[in-house]
Amino acid sequence: SFQEIAYTVADAFFGEDVDAESLKKIVYDTLQFDVPLVNVNDNIYSLELFHGPTLAFKDVGARFMSRLLGYFIKKQGLKEINVLVATSGDSGSAVANGFLGVEGIHVYVLYPKGKVSKIQECQFTTLGKNITALEIDGTFDDCQALVKSAFMDADLNKHLKLTSANSINVARFLPQAFYYFYAYAQLKKA
C-alpha cells in the first residue's frame, strides 16, 4: 500500500529521530486518501496527486510536516511554535488544512490581496482555530519577503519560536519522495 511504502521511506529518513510506532502513526494519518497511478497511453502513466483534502499535491508534505512537528513539540516539551507560510494558493491551502487543530502549533498564512483564487482563499481564511490568514497588499514576493525578514529577526525568532512551512523546510518536501517509490512499485506490478 501507499502507506506501507511511505512508512519504509520515512523510516529511512527519520528512523533514528522518531520511534517506529509514532512514525507509522504519522505516515498513516498523513495518507488518508488515494494517490492512484493512471495509465494515460501505452507506457505513459500519471500519478494523480489531487485526491487530498485541498486537491493540491502539497497535501502530503503539509500533512506529514504538521504531524511530525506536533510529535517533536511533545517530545521536546515545547508549549507552542509558530509556522509562517507565504502563498499564492496551493501552499496556503495545504498547510492550513494539514495543520488545522494540531496542538501547540499556530500557523500564519501570508497571501497577496486579489492574487489568490477564491476557492483557495476560502480554504485558508475560513478555518479559524490555530490558523490565521493575513492578506498582504502586494505580491507573493512581498509576502515571501515579510516571512524572510521575520526569520532574520533573532529577537522575534527567540520570542515566537518560528519555523517555515514553505518548501525550504525539509519536513515539507521530503515526504514528496513517497510519490516516486510508490509510483515505481505500482509500475513494477503493471
Predicted regions: what they are:
Residues S1-A190:
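PLP-dependent amino-acid enzyme catalytic core
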